[in-house]
Amino acid sequence: MSASAARSRNKQSKLRDDEQLDISKDEFNRIQEAFGREEFRKLFFDYVEEIQDPENRKIYEEEITQLEKERGVEVRFIHPKPGFVIKTALDGELKCFINIAGSEEIERPKNEVATDPSSGSRGLSWSIPMAQTSSRDDCDAKNNHCKVFDVVFHPDALHLAKRNKQFRQCLIDTALDAVEREYKVSLDRANLKFPKLDYKGIPRPTVIRKLADNPTAEEQEPHPLAHMFPTKPPAPGKPEPRVLPMKTKPTPVPEFTVPRYSIKHSHDVDLSEYTDELDAKLHVTVPRSLVVEIELPLLRSTAECQLDVTSKSVYLFSERQGAKYRLKLDLPFSVDDKAGQARFDTDMRRLSITLPVVRKSTKEEAQMHDTLRHFSREDSGVELHSNSESPVEEDPDGELSDSKADISEISSPTTATVRLANSPFLKNSVHYQLPSKFDCNVLDNVMAFVLHVPNVQPDSIEQLREQRSLHLQFATIGSGYYPTHYAFYVELPAEHEDSAIESVEAEAWDNNVVLKLCLSSQSETPASYLAGLDATELKEYPVHGQYNVKSSGKANAKENAPLDVKFVHNQEGQALKVTIRPGTKEEEEKGNQDQEPESDKQHQQQSQNKKAGKKQRKRNKKERSLSESACADMIFQEPLAKNPELQPKTMFKFPSQRKQRSYSECNDSIGGSHRGILKRFSRYGPRPSMSDSCSSIDDCSSYSCSVDASGTSLFSHSFGGIPEEDRSDAGLSESCKKTVRFNDHIMKQVFRLDSSILGQRKKNQKRRDLKLRAQQRRLSEGDSVDYEETRGSALKQQENQSRNCNKPNGGSVLHDSGLDLTGAPGAHSNHNESEAKNALMFEMDD
């Protein structure tokens, strides 16, 4: 703003010769009072007349000449004599006059024979001396401000200009060049006028000074301080006058002049733009209207010109003699040309055009911003939620559950434009490319193509579908906002004549385009397809994947067929051998004809068909069967009570390996597919943080052995949920129940928007590792002593139990775990057996 204001002040000072008048208020009041007196005004007018008197001016010039001669300077006063006047415009804003005058004090014009270097023709080369006066302000016939310049030549030059038009034009060009070069202005040469005036204004003499050829005696005397300064070297010769360079090529004069103009953005104050709404500053950069100001100093009114305004341009044309203007201006915004206003200021000779700007609606602006944001978006590899939620930090104590899965952005299907077959599909003026990589998969009667082309515009997808072929074209926008066009033609193989395309669906994603072809129900699954840029450039490609939903369903049905499970009791080894094989069709038909009691028995046998896992200790690799649990003594309680002879020890025979797990014989196969909410973990491993504590049996064993009071099933599923607490099982041991308590503390994760996701993930992983090592160190220090003490007491109790089993009156056969499977009363009353059972349960877990 300050630069433009300073430029405006300099221009006004240059055009008007305004000088700063330093006058105080007191001095201004004194001058005002003096002019109010009649005596002072009379004296002032007498002074003006004395100055303007020619006799007095002559005496004044003689005195000045004598004074300058005493100083060694020759002074000549030049009095311009009228010649002719040139009228034009100064910088396209101000009217100006150039007086072509004559004076005897100026040297005569000289010529010499010269040869034109461009054409080789001989001619005369003129040297025209001239003199210029300072510019002055004046008024025109309508009392408007104007500028006046004087250019003085010798009278012989004016005489030649009257007789020769070429010399006259040369004189005019010389005067115009002198004014532009001296005052750094631009003159309108296309609109030159020659009014019927000999001279504009009052002639003012000018002075030419030069050193005197014959200096006076006083000037020849040395200066008293001349010896103190070094002498100036003498000039090599007589100084020659300055010669202006002659133009080798004439300046082309345009037929029409481009007037000066300015475009101003007008914006009124709207209080709605100062609110906190999202769309408050949507139009803050768009002006309310455009004001176009055109300077026309040579026109009297707008009737002499033609003005045409459109939504994006302004056109001005004037062909009046002496005022030829032509302007074609492009506007920065779309305007309403029907609601515009134009006004011509006759004093300033300025045309002002006010045009209201057409603003887009809020919906169109939002759509445009979304499109630009989509084109300029850089994929950072991080998916953000649509509601601007920050991603949750990973759980430091454990991984998140499967229910908190990642949510991927789902693109809406794109409705592609369908063209008719008779119209040309691909444009001849556009270069199309075939996608460099594409895949094809077939699922039943649907062919899915994945075209790996990123940043596809959904609006550019067009397709041409026929009975056995499809032609697709689309465009992408790169980083330079330059569109790239692609085309893809696919055709079904010729061997499948019955195949036909029923429907087509094209979806534009961020990194690819998914094309789905739905074939008719009679179509066979193709093993290959033809693809290319168009029908003339086809190549056969194989189908990568073929999937049949019906066939896979039958295979799964066969795999899920019931298995045949057999149990063989070994009396000598007191062990139970389990044989599992797939059942035949005859056995299945026979099993369907069995009665309900046999079905119950079959369910009891199928509850043992799942493999039981075993955990072995890391040091001695000691094997122990899972059937030695606290609840195994109730599995065959009723059958063994009736037949006391068959009381073997139930043990699964599996090869020796470390960290085995098997299903218990008390497991029910019907509910084996359900999983409980309790975490299965090792005693010495890290514990999940989702629960504070569990029962003693959960701390010791990786499998559930809880008992419920139902008559049909005495035991819960090994991997089932938490059993309901019932009053009927109050007599059972509390260690056979699953209990869990949840912590009331809520973990809160905070994610900073300015932090790096990879850096935050590394920090969380390091924190989890430190916490895990500290927890393992605490467990290893406290549990090692407890384990040795528990193991010693358990071994002693096992020896006592083996002695009781060898007694003849015992009548009970015990497992090596100390549990009575016969259901004898003496076994339940023995308190040592219960302690041994719990001790060995702790020993089973590694």
Swiss-Prot record:
Subunit structure: Interacts with Pp1alpha-96A, Pp1-87B, Pp1-13C and flw.
Pfam families: PIH1, PIH1_CS
Alphabetical UniProt keywords: Cytoplasm, Phosphoprotein
Biological process, per Gene Ontology: axonemal dynein complex assembly; cilium-dependent cell motility
Designated gene of the protein: Nop17l
Biased composition annotated in UniProt, kind: Basic and acidic residues: 372-382, 583-603
GO function term, MF aspect, one: protein phosphatase 1 binding
Protein name per the record: Protein kintoun
